[in-house]
């Protein structure tokens, strides 16, 4: 038995998220597990570093699993890529120590969110659209308020009585890149849909519809009387996993 690490990228548009689901609902984890089991002739269960939601993409998702198969890993990755749909790629497959766990060994997760200010037929699978010119200076001011350890319940789909509400954000900043407005945010962990709720709130600030002071109150208190909405999944990428 050996422990394997897979580095994976995917276009999440046509998948119901990372995590396997019952029945025939297509998920990234379920698709890879099925093919891995087919190739190795053994039941394979993957552990992912991040549980991306329906429609969310990954530049670097990391998964780990235990395998009895002694197949050369370069051959295993090649076989997987030959069978996987073109929207999922195995970028790397390596042997790791038995105590490695893709989720629990991770110390930092980084997401990027890409925003176009005007609609684009070519980019709509991979961006959210603001339909407005944005004040990135205001959005950057709001992003700085997120850094640190906070209760992010107001920016998530977690139940209010969930015991694990606090996340430590190590960096959060907006910048312009190739005609897009891009958020990059890193933290030790994220609540469900947390990045998308934060993005929507900061976009509202960039449009002059949400005062930064109110946003700061929401971050510091963990509560909100403001109607929270999640930004579209299409613009969000799991960008990097740190170990």
From Swiss-Prot:
Q: How does it assemble?
A: Homodimer.
The enzyme's E.C. designation = 5.4.99.12
Q: Can you say what this protein is called?
A: tRNA pseudouridine synthase A
- CDD domains from the UniProt entry: PseudoU_synth_EcTruA
Q: Does the keyword Cell inner membrane apply?
A: no
Residues the record lists as binding substrate: 111
What's a Gene Ontology MF term here?
A: RNA binding
Q: Which InterPro entries match?
A: PsdUridine_synth_cat_dom_sf, PsdUridine_synth_TruA, PsdUridine_synth_TruA_a/b_dom, PsdUridine_synth_TruA_C, TruA/RsuA/RluB/E/F_N
The record's keywords, sorted A to Z, are: Isomerase, tRNA processing
Chain's gene name: truA
Matching entries from Pfam families are given as:
PseudoU_synth_1 (PF01416)
List, from the UniProt record, the residues annotated as the active site of this protein: 53
The record lists the catalysed reaction(s) as: uridine(38/39/40) in tRNA = pseudouridine(38/39/40) in tRNA
Query: Main EC class of this protein?
Result: isomerase
- Gene Ontology BP terms: tRNA pseudouridine synthesis
- Outline what the protein does: Formation of pseudouridine at positions 38, 39 and 40 in the anticodon stem and loop of transfer RNAs.
Query: What is stated as this protein's family in its record?
Result: Belongs to the tRNA pseudouridine synthase TruA family.
